[in-house]
Amino acid sequence: MAVSIEDARAAVLRHAEVLDAEDVFLDDALGRALAVDAHAPNDVPPFAASAMDGFAIRAADTAGGAATLRLVGEAKAGAAAGVAVHSGTAVRISTGAPVPDGADAIVPQEMTTSDGATVTVDGQVARGYHVRPPGEDIRSGELVVGAGTLLGPAELGVLASMNIPRPSVVRRPRVAIAGTGDELTDPGKPLAPGAIRDSNGPALGGAVHRAGGELVARVRVGDDLEATISVLGAALRDVDMLITSGGVSVGPHDHVRPALARLGYSEVFAGVKLKPGRPTTFAVGEDGTLVFALPGNPVSALMGFRLFVVPALDAMLGRSGEHHPVKATADEPLEGAVGRTTVIRCRTTLQDDGWHVRPTKSQDSHILTSMLGVDALALVPEDRDGIGAGEPVEIEFVG
């Protein structure tokens, strides 16, 4: 019996578990979830540093106001200060350079005049002026980035500053895709009478990559039960997830569900009260491998991926698998179907009163071009036959 979209999503999340960890280089860690807490092994910065280009001095030398000091050297970023500051002396310093011993203030260049041998400070400065103390940004031992955090550019920079070149992140799910149908032909090959191009394979493969999965295999099988068992069985080896398209309904040539049963996979649900995508099926193996059997119609396959596979991949990657809808206003009527949640492909605009949506062209499940330019899905509840123009509607953004 078909289940509601809410119950289907909840069932998926009950079975989608966070995967184990792996260490990756920082350049490969963008968008990954940190697997363990990152504590600072040392202070950042590790030494007192200059915040300005200028001169390192002793603040006491300016207690009486303007002062002329003898230049005794230079401190550059990236090198230890090779000279100390004593009363009556100063050291030229660059931004980020270590503050020389004896200095306790930095005077910006624009507050001075210099003839190369001496520097005159315009007025009194206080201790600590433009000095970045050790640990100003991060203290040694501090918890800086917590486990489960999605690593963005700022997080990568912070980890680098803490000398963590290979953070431990949640492993990417290994995903296989299997298309079904005698009629499918690869792009670039001659098209026989009655055949069609396999658009689902490339579309779902791209969707897997975009959602953070690792596509390890993309296979196809004709409309034969024993062949389907063999191909799916091989595709299920050493993966975390299998996604099939087509062959999931109740016709005489639909063999995916019987094949999965023969392979020992238990159906969690078979059918969702959803338009398009009603035949969508979800099964789980004894080892926890997830199988999403999506319809063959291109739009239905992509809808099923967005609504059910993406939350599963998010959860497996250590992200939140919850997808919270946003309120919007329908600028045109949105047709629903009582008894099923109807998902309308839309384009959005942000206006003064919030988000507005308009449906794309034909909402038929075989019109793949209706997905072009779509940035949101509008959800017409299963107890409504439509949403009128000007009425509120829940939407989920897609990216």
Could you describe each region identified by the protein language model?
Residues E22-D27, V36, G78, V119, ...:
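Flexible glycine/proline-rich
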Residues M1-A66, A117, P133, R319-V343:
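Short, low-complexity N-terminal leaders and the immediately following helix N-cap/first helix
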Residues A2-E6, D20-D23, D27-D28, R32, ...:
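Electropositive phosphate-/nucleotide-binding environments in soluble metabolic enzymes
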Residues G146, D254, Q351-G354:
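Proline-centered turn/helix-capping motifs that create local helix->coil transitions or kinks
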Residues I5, A11, A38-P41, F55-G222, ...:
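Short, glycine/charged-enriched hinge/interface segments at domain edges or termini
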Residues R9, L13, D53, Q109-E110, ...:
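Predominant activation on well-ordered alpha-helical scaffold segments within soluble catalytic domains
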Residues M1-I5, P165-L294, P298-M303:
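Helix-rich terminal scaffold detector
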Residues S50, H86, V107, R237, ...:
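Structured loop/turn residues at beta-strand edges in well-structured enzyme cores
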